[in-house]
Amino acid sequence: MARKKDPAVLTLDRTLQARTVQGKLCEKLEGGRVRCVACGHRCVILDGLDGICRVRFNHGGTLHVPRGYVAGLQVDPTEKKPFFHAFPGAVALSFGMLGCDFHCGYCQNWLTSQALRDVSALSPPRDVAPEEIVAIAKRHRAPVMVSTYNEPLITSEWAVEVFALARMEGITCGYVSNGNGTPEVLEFIRPHVDLYKVDLKGFRDASYRQLGGKLDNVLRTIERLHAMGFWVEIVTLLVPGFNDSREELRDIASFVASVSRDIPWHVTAFHQDYKMLDTADTTARDLMRAADLGFEAGLRYVYAGNLPGRVGDLENTRCPQCRTLLVERFGYRILHYRLADDGRCPSCHSTIAGFWRSGWKIPEMDGGLPGRVPRSVPIPAAQILPIGGQFGEEAGVPPDRRSASRRRGIRSFRPS
């Protein structure tokens, strides 16, 4: 049965429709249909409708995709992403748009990811040019730039446009993603993206379907990412009663090890958020138990996150050969750093897996203790979009483009 969309969501929808360009990650089909290949859903979209992500739509047989705004823009420690084996102690310029192809009930970025589904989820979008984003990164001396907050795969055309300029300035770029990719989108972003964090949300297909995805597609994406030479780190948010059984965690760890024992696996603590307000928070003991399973599976780098100072040695990086402490952390803070700038252990000279840049030195802070904390980046108020303005003028799309289907609340995609 068709669901009627809340008027406030419709208003946001109209605001975003003007900020689009013709998509590249698609295939034209007969009858004015298009197949989108930006994510694993591979939506076949009829003229006048949109995909499951609700931000990529078909108008006149042409796929339109988001461009020219951000809903989140912040300077973060790289450890927050988390990337523990790339530019330790640095900051990353993080940006994101709106929308997601999943609908996780425990999403910790739901204000951006679910804005097109949930009237209570809204981060006001702000007009911004790619050049402005790169200039902000340079101003904050950020060697890393990351597309995050919403699902970056569904806004890959925009990310690539920004990253192309960033790379010209020597900035390394990355994705923080659910991993629901396709071979086409990975080939599209590969020239511009070096770092890729995947949320592996569990190891049961039934659970993945509750979230709006399929387990096998995420697993194949992880395998492709590693084979294509991306630096991959994997995060599993431990949700009590959902994905924290010993058997499931062992399966996750074994899979990651089968791809590469050098892939860092982060097990992180769930806290009550969005629609899951009755589930107990993850304990430090739960994280340490999960980490033990990772080491038992043969993984060399296993970390526990979101509970700083409560998980023993599991925030730190040690040499897997001689066990020398290389990076000591407390949350996002680096307390001690001994890794050579070429990524080698100073004691046994073993190479530590990671994305290391020759000549990289950890930023010097007062007392040698980098205490960088996330901070939002201000954008002039004039660039905050007035929700509900006339749509379509920039893209040349008439304001009544799909008003009929929207008023009826018709579901707007068909699986291929």
Residue locations for each model-derived region?
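Auxiliary Fe-S-binding modules of radical SAM enzymes
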Residues: 2-47, 246-416
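Conserved AdoMet/S-adenosylmethionine-binding subsite of the radical SAM
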Residues: 127-286, 290-293
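Cys/His-coordinated zinc-binding microdomains
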Residues: 40, 54-57, 101, 108, ...
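Residue-level detector of family-conserved "landmark" positions at structurally sensitive sites
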Residues: 117, 147, 176, 234-235, ...
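Conserved, mostly hydrophobic/aromatic
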Residues: 104, 198, 302
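Conserved Radical SAM active-site core
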Residues: 58-195, 363-372
